[in-house]
Amino acid sequence: MTAPTLEEIKNCIKSIPDYPIPGIMFRDITSLIENGAAFSATINLLVERYKDQNISKVVGTEARGFIFGAPLAAAIGAGFVPVRKPGKLPRTTVHENYELEYGTDSLHIHSDAIKKNERVLLVDDLLATGGTAEASIKLIHRSGGIVIESAFVIELPALKGAQKLHALNVPYFSLIKFEGE
């Protein structure tokens, strides 16, 4: 059996209008991960891109970054570091505050999870406004890691999240782009 193409993977992602609020077109990756062949092909595409880049740690953002980051880390022989919301990690953490549409939040990683000069790949399911990625990159930098790239399964270019990554001098890669919102 042939692995699904990138277009077939994209077609597995359901678009849900007016979720979570009216006017939003939600791109639902759960429909992708429910399809074993498409999910496996997605991970394999990421593995092919990163397998020879000497990555020490893959950092995945809560919660959907875990879905793609952990199997990628295992496949390339890297450690996996979860980025979590406040109060979810048991050891001492470092955190970064970031802006939401209505207020602020913070992201945390264990303070000893990333060593100085470790090569780090940031992984998340979606690049939209870039706020979560920006905060995660700042956490990695504060921990001494070198972000070699940020990888996303989906990018929404209209929301200009890539601009925040460019401002931090971090290259990024996205498998699938959904134009518009």
From Swiss-Prot:
NCBIfam families: apt (TIGR01090), PRK02304.1-1 (NF002632), PRK02304.1-3 (NF002634), PRK02304.1-5 (NF002636). Belongs to the purine/pyrimidine phosphoribosyltransferase family. HAMAP family: Aden_phosphoribosyltr. Pathway: Purine metabolism; AMP biosynthesis via salvage pathway; AMP from adenine: step 1/1. This is Adenine phosphoribosyltransferase. It is an enzyme of class 2 (transferase). Catalyzes a salvage reaction resulting in the formation of AMP, that is energically less costly than de novo synthesis. GO terms for biological process: adenine salvage; AMP salvage; purine ribonucleoside salvage. It is found in: Cytoplasm. Its EC number is 2.4.2.7. GO terms for molecular function: adenine phosphoribosyltransferase activity. It catalyses: AMP + diphosphate = 5-phospho-alpha-D-ribose 1-diphosphate + adenine. It comes from the Bacteria. Keywords: Cytoplasm, Glycosyltransferase, Purine salvage, Transferase. Signal peptide: none annotated. It comes from Psychromonas ingrahamii (strain DSM 17664 / CCUG 51855 / 37). Homodimer. InterPro entries: Ade_phspho_trans, Adenine_PRTase, PRibTrfase_dom, PRTase-like. GO terms for cellular component: cytosol.
